[in-house]
Amino acid sequence: LSDAAPVAPHLYILADDLIWATRLAGQGRTLGAAVVTLNGISDLQALVARGPLSAQDLIAIDTTARGFEPEAAVRAAASAGRTLALAQHDDPSLRAALLEAGALRVMPYRALFERGHAILAELLGLPLPAVGSLEAPSGSGGTTK
């Protein structure tokens, strides 16, 4: 048996909106993910060029961003790994296009606000912290502060 600690999944975030990027990053860190904020489409392209991500890693893309075309960004991200698209709840045609482009899931911002920790925990394969806890569960079952 190995004593090596399990490697935390990565949560890569591509978002122009600082509030949503910060919220996603905070939720990912609370869960124990290794959070990486991508600074624009060029960072996403560099990530994709490195090759496939691990099976637990997740790329979250804010599709309301103005600096890139959302469907193309989701298509590029999905070629490297699992992709979560964040979109407005009232745009069913965009939702369908993002799923067609390869998004694993298209989540409205309201769901991120209301159930973001639970959704990200499920997608990243991480345990959900106890309600009111400031501790993130570690991969070994203990907690880290």
Regions found by a protein language model. Give the residues of each.
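Output/docking surface of receiver
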Residues: 102-117
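Alpha4 helix (beta4-alpha4-beta5 surface) of REC/receiver domains from two-component response regulators
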Residues: 90-105
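A short, hydrophobic beta-strand element within the central beta-sheet of small alpha/beta folds
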Residues: 81-90
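Conserved acidic segment of CheY-like receiver
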Residues: 8-18
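Non-catalytic signal-transmission and effector/linker regions of two-component phosphorelay proteins
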Residues: 1-10, 25, 117-145
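Conserved phosphotransfer microenvironments
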Residues: 59-76
